[in-house]
Amino acid sequence: LLLVSAAMVLASPLHSQATDPVPDLELVPSREMPKATPPEEVPAFLRWLLHPQKHGMMLNLPMVDTDPNRGVTYGVMPIWVIQESSGDRIEQIHAPSLTYNSDFGPTPTYRYFYYPKDDASLAVRTAVAKFEHEVMGQYDDKTFKDTEISVSLLAQWNRDASQRYYGRGPNSSQRHQTNYTEEYIQYLASVGVPFTPSSHWRAHLSDWLTADKISDGPLPGLTAFSTQFPKSSQAASGREVIHVERLTVDYDTRDQALTTSRGAYLSVFDEFSAKDLGSEEEYSRHGIDGRYFFPWDEEHTHVTAAQVKFEQLLGNAPFWLESRMGGKYSLRAYGDGRYTDRGIMVGNVEQRYIFYRSKMAAVTTEFEVAPFLGLGTVFDHPQIMQGRYARPVFGSAVRAVARPQIVGSLDIGVGQEGVAVFMDVNYSF
């Protein structure tokens, strides 16, 4: 079950840069191989999915993903897991897939993961479709040269045809919804060091370079982006180069980064883009992301989770690099990028309740329900932020969790514009 759940991490479809324009690193499945389980103890559906081999395992994984902007994507993904010849840890993972979406057609994708040591990973992904394509490579080493220094490198060429834009401001109308295609080539390099040995405080310095091109999207039934927003389209003509330097300081006492049940996380950043660095735009941005997780019992059956996020951009930046509100990792009653402006403030709180624990194939899976509330808005600057444009949301998530790394989640959010449904992996925060 751990391998089946871990495979869900691989199943993410092509996606654009995150709500925070400087991209996060891709999730990489754990290299831990679960202990073998007697065949009679493995449920029948897992015996169909799992096929043990001499040095590894084959998996046949169905894929389903829902998103307000992309609709339903489904398909299959066979996975070949290769163990070390002299041990029981995973050394390589090959994960090709074939998915289908009614708007974007079939998408063949190939994923490859390599683990040179326990705290390092190499990830490669390539995909091609009618309107989209991607080539991505990432290397992450949390103990560079056997020290507490972390090093990360990301290079990506991506074309995402699902992007939406409604205009700038907290009162942008659904009637102005357009679809655009974002094509970009980017690289990200990051180095992190602890303040003191084994400290909860770390500093990260990141260098991000991207070349973006914006064009009309392919989705039918929507006004062309260049027609609805001619000024933004004209400003986005050609490929625009942005070069950003970012300094981040974070504090982290969470028990697990992905399946958190207790602890606190605080991240503060400041970044700037300047023509002296080769960028075509000059701007700066600062922000804060705070999260707290409070367990109400020793078994962590009841956990209250809360998040507050703030960002503010100063100077000139193209619209696709402004703060965007909406989506599973922002405000769960709207699609990605529903609201766009120079600043954003979002708060979320949810009560996680584990209602059932099941042990299958030597792995304990927890099933939880998590009603949530959220409130958020975008603004040009905080001094003119207006309460009437604060967007409240409520809803609930149902999840299957295999700690410490795997979460399968169905999130249903209700807001002022109706219901949004997200089904994929990971917590919202």
Language-model region placement:
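Bacterial N-terminal signal peptides
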Residues: L1-L10
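Outer-membrane beta-barrel proteins
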Residues: A44-H51, I79-S86, Y114-D118, D140-K145, ...
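Gram-negative/organellar outer-membrane beta-barrel architecture
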Residues: L50-L59, D65-V241, V407, G415-F429
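Hydrophobic, lipid-facing positions within transmembrane beta-strands of outer-membrane proteins
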Residues: M58-N60, Y74-V76, P106-Y110, H133-G137, ...
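Membrane-embedded beta-strand positions of outer-membrane beta-barrel proteins
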Residues: N60-P62, H94-L98, V124-T126, V151-A155, ...
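C-terminal beta-signal and terminal closure region of outer-membrane beta-barrel proteins
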Residues: Q383-F429
